[in-house]
Amino acid sequence: MIDKSGETQAAVRIGVDIGGTKIAAGIVADSDPTTVIEYRRRPTPTTNVIDEVAGIIQELIDASPVAVSTIGIGAPGVIDPIAGEVVSSGPTMQGWAGTKIADTLRGQFPLPIAVHNDVRVMGLGESVYGAGHDFDNVLFVSLGTGVGGALVRDGELVASPHFTAGELRCLWGRLPDGSAALLESFASGPGLASCYNAHAENPAVDLHEIMSRYHAGEEYARDVIEEHLFACGVAIGGFISAIDVDAVIVGGGVGTIGDAIINPFARGVRDGAIPPINEVPVIQAQLGNHAPIVGAAYLGKTQG
C-alpha cells in the first residue's frame, strides 16, 4: 500500500461496532492491529442506522493516509455472515431484523465487507490479539448489559447452520436458592443489580454502587456477587464440557471489573466442568473498549 508521499505503508482496515445506543468505528493498521488510529463515535439513531454507519465509514476513508483495504462490522442480533444480513434481533433496535447490511454498504463502498454479530466480533478480536492469543480453541464470555459469547477455533469464528454458535444468553443456571434462571437474568450488570435489590435493606442504583459496597466490606454485596458469578461459572463449565475448549476468556463491562468477578466465576467453571476440562484457564479480557473495533477490522481482513 503506497501513501501520498510514495512510501509503502501497511494495509489499513475499518472496523465498525454497531450497538443499540452507539456506533463506534475506527481505522486499524495491519502493522499494529490492536491500536485504533482514527476513531469515531455517534449515537445510534432510531431510524436509518445504515445511513449513519455509511457516513462514519466515509469520514474514516477521508481521514485515512492510505487507501482502506477492507471493512468489518459487528452488529447486534443473529447475523448471517455469508449474506451480511440481520436474521433476527431483540427489542433494542426495532425493525432491525432483515437489514441487509453488507449489500447496502457495498452499493456505496467498492471494498470487501464482512459482517457478524457484535459479541462474536469482540470475542474474535480478543481471541486472536488479546487474552486468547496463545490458545487455538476459545470460548469468549461477555458479561455486560447482557450475556453473550463467541466460539473461536484456529483464529476463526465457528460457523453454524443457524448462525448462533457461541450464543449464551439462553443458557440456564442454578441460583443459590436452588431455582433455575437464565444467565442473563442474574449474571449481567442489570441482572446482578436486580438480584441484589431483591433482598437489600438499602437498594442500590446499579452494579457500580454494589461493587463500591463490596469493596467497602459489605458482606451482603460480597455474597450476591460471589454466589451469582459462581452459579454462572457452573453453567459455563457444563457448556465447555460439551464443546471442549483450551481457554475461557471473560469480557464485557462486568467481566472486566476484576478479581471480584473472575475468581468466583472461575471457581464455578471448575466445579461445573468434568475433568480434565475443569482445569482450563479462565482469563480476563485484555483489549479494553476498542476490542469490538479491533475484532471487526480483523473480520474484514480475513472474511471480507
Question: Over which residues does each language-model region extend?
Answer:
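Active-site glycine-centered loops adjacent to acidic/histidine catalytic or metal-binding residues
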Residues: 17, 118, 144
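Short, small/polar residue-rich loop motifs at catalytic or cofactor-binding pockets
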Residues: 21-22, 144-146
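Structural signature of FAD isoalloxazine-binding scaffolds in flavoprotein oxidoreductases
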Residues: 164-168
